[in-house]
Amino acid sequence: MRVKEIGEIKSGKAHSAYSAGSVPVYMSGGIVAHIDTAMDEGPAVIVPIRGSIEKQYFVSTGTPFFCGATCVYIKCRKDVMDARFLFHLLQSERLERFNASSTVPSLSREKLANMLVFVPPLAYQRGVVRTLDSMLRAIKGIEETLQCIGNIWQCEREEVFKLLDRGREPARR
């Protein structure tokens, strides 16, 4: 099926006229501001069409959001496509290969709308989502652990040099 057949593709718009608030504004680089007006609520997949076209964003069910002018968002037909599955699918598609510009990367709405996507049964989609989300949680845990190890390494290294500056050898562990 084509993307335009699995859901509605809606355009983002400029957010500068709105006041500060709690609704996240998504642009091609991610969340750039929070305003007082929601454009829609999740589930939705936000797809940048100018700038960082390789990054897609998922908005969870019931979460209000505002889609900025450099993006479009897709509201999936619930009887056809799980929005989280579409998010993972688009992440694997490497949308940057559809780049239509030599300067600022851009993805035409028409190319996105006409892109063919794999649409398995909903039960299969939900199983894939559970598996991929579980893997992403595990990866995040590993990244957090590596960050902690890096912080410990930095502190230990600094301590070693402080002791060496004072003419003492660090204690062996």
Can you annotate each of these PLM segments?
Residues 1-27, 114, 119-173:
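Non-catalytic DNA-recognition/assembly elements of restriction-modification systems
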Residues 27-91, 100-103, 108-112:
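A short beta-sheet element
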Residues 88-95, 134:
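Short, intrinsically disordered, mixed-charge
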